[in-house]
Amino acid sequence: MSGILHLFFIFAQNFKYMIRKLYVLILSLLVATSLYALESDEIRAVWLTTNYRLDWPSVAGTTPRVIERQKQDLIRILDQLAEVGINTVFFQSRIRGEVFYDSSIEQQSQFLTGSNGVKSDFDPLAFAVEECHRRKMTCHAWMVCMPLGGKKYIARHALDKTLARNREFVTLHDGEYFLEPSDPRTADYLADIAGEIVSNYKVDGVHLDYIRYPEKAASYPDQQRYARSGKKKPLAQWRRDNITHIVYTIYNKVKSVNPDVQLSSAPLGVYNGRFGKHYYGWNAFEAGYQEVERWLQEDKHDFIAPMMYYKGAMFYPFVIDWCKRSYGKPVVPGLGIYRLNEPGSNWDLNEIEKQIWWSRHLGASGYALFRAGNLLNDFPALLWRIRYLNE
């Protein structure tokens, strides 16, 4: 009997060992699968800002010497981004009524040319697309949609003609001019710009920014327009429908030109202010009138990059919330690495590293860093960590 018990004990020990080995094998396969998905599918993006020449170009002008400097600076930036594993660039192609490409609709930015009303022989968007593709990176044309600027900005950038040409669908609010969301001509105007880009450039996507109502929307002067609409729905839903109409018009235009070009946007970082026991006033649905969940559900977006420039309890629960609302579309949390520079912000490099790690494990499809200059110029230690996380 003792011999039988001894054999049973050996079998039991070996069985437990085999189960442990099987568990380790399965876990290893899952990890390997996860790593493969990370390498092949994850969106690792950066916003490359041209407004005020924050990231690029470092110099403005149209002489051959300046143009060559602009090209070399952009090559250097893209080389550095590719080296640390960034695979997606949101290249700011339209700012406030000005563009960084050869357009028949809007003028080239003085941040590129150095002067108003001047056209450069250099086409930055074409160059950015070519150089991104050379590095196996995707390039998305980043469009700032609604704001045109204040009176001083309009004068300084000689946008008075643009303003006058579109005056019937422009609204002055809190000292700033905005394309009017409720006027159908706004949707057509922005769709024409997106269509022009997709028709003339081999971009991988069009990325919409500021596709919302402005701050202090409670005092936004659209009451007469709302009254003329017949007030058939609440003001808030009427506004959301206005933004949705713009998004859908742009989407339809982009896909009609090239179905393979993606449409994405950067909504506000919190979707709905009523979250658990708390209320967050600055949110996409109620403050910006962005009905993002509807856009995703009705297949009018390919992915989103919400601007989640917060940390801790203001970050992680909302990653989960966005993923739950995404209807299977990729969610790419926008990380505010510029916060590391803010006095008294109490941010450190570990925070960004944790946000990337947790985003990957909470169901997100990558991350987007705001912005390129902060990553490449301000935080060399973060640059090293990003490279490590992307390997």
Describe each PLM feature range.
Residues 41-43, 49-71, 141, 146-196, ...:
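Active-site-adjacent "subsite" loops/lids of carbohydrate-active enzymes
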Residues 50, 262-280, 322-352:
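Active-site clefts of carbohydrate-active enzymes
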Residues 292-293, 297-315, 332-391:
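Substrate-binding cleft of secreted/luminal carbohydrate-active enzymes
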Residues 54-68, 107-121, 174-188, 232-243, ...:
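The substrate-binding groove and active-site-proximal loops of carbohydrate-active enzymes
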Residues 66-81, 186-196, 282-298, 318, ...:
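Short, acidic/polar
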Residues 72-98:
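Catalytic domains of carbohydrate-active enzymes, especially glycoside hydrolases
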Residues 86-87, 126, 135, 158-160, ...:
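Polysaccharide-binding and catalytic clefts of secreted carbohydrate-active enzymes
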Residues 95-143, 230-257:
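Aromatic-lined substrate-binding rim segments of carbohydrate-active enzymes
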